Amino acid sequence: MKNWSGNVTFEANLVVRPTSIEDIKSAIKAADKVRALGSAHSFNQIAASKDVLLSFENFPKDIEIDAASKQVRIAAGVRYGEAAIALNAAGLALPNMGSLPHITVVGATSTGTHGSGARNKNLSAAIIKIELINANGEDVTIEGEELHAARVGLGALGIIHHVTLQAINAFNVSQTVYRDLHFENWISNFDQVMGNNYSVSAFTTWGDSLVDQLWIKSHMENDVLPGNEFYTGTAAEEKLHPLEGADTASATEQLGSVGPWPVSYTHLTLPTNREV
């Protein structure tokens, strides 16, 4: 098994697929070393243990929403795209998401996935509670000030089986992609460009004097929509994929269309091609 880009190979002696918290405890007690596996998207070998890997593909996909407190308890193995659909149905949203909807909530937050938007914190900042099993097979709950040391725990504190996130009210998003922003113009106006709307992402191959694509996601209640021209960039007239030449069918809605936040808040849709 390899990660999405093929540069990391998983060579565990045993892959355990727990279906309960008791299964997690049993696996920990039976092994010398255990690592948890998320969506296998990481660029490095953080989850590539040669001993025992825990895969949460068979673990119950709990998404427990408390509408009054705007909090959601999410199980390991649940993908961001799945959580987004459930939250939107309850009138709620996540304050930030990554580019890809197929990454797992627990895996992405544990490894510091950042999302986009100069006004937004990284994904782990939404965590208000962590539930895990430590190396002794004991239940541990982390809240309050201890979260500062635990949110991006890199799997070192134990096997996380649930996290609770603080959500916000659902909102609509408009997405426009701009082509060929002059690189020097981008750099000289970097803060203004990247902080212009709720979420801004730049794609460049560093091969010429242009930023190939600039993806702007506008919060329809709080942002001023950009026009057809944006800092020397021009709004695309057709749907684009972040990778030039790739099939645009998997890209989220663009061309200034307005829709619920799960429709355009990531760059790609569920299901996502693992090769992208």
Task: Describe each region flagged by the PLM.
Residues 61-63, 128-133, 216:
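Short polybasic amphipathic segments
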Residues 6-102, 109-117, 202:
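Glycine-rich N-terminal segment of FAD-binding domains in flavoprotein oxidoreductases
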Residues 266-272:
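Conserved small/polar residues in nucleotide/adenosyl-binding loops
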Residues 198-199, 204-244:
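Loop-centered beta-sheet repeat module
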Residues 108-196, 207, 223, 227-234:
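FAD-binding subdomain of flavoenzyme oxidoreductases
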Residues 21-25, 35-41, 159-161, 181-183, ...:
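Terminal, non-catalytic protein-protein interaction segments that mediate quaternary/complex assembly
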Residues 49, 66-68, 134-136, 206-209:
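Short acidic-glycine loop/turn motifs at beta-strand connectors
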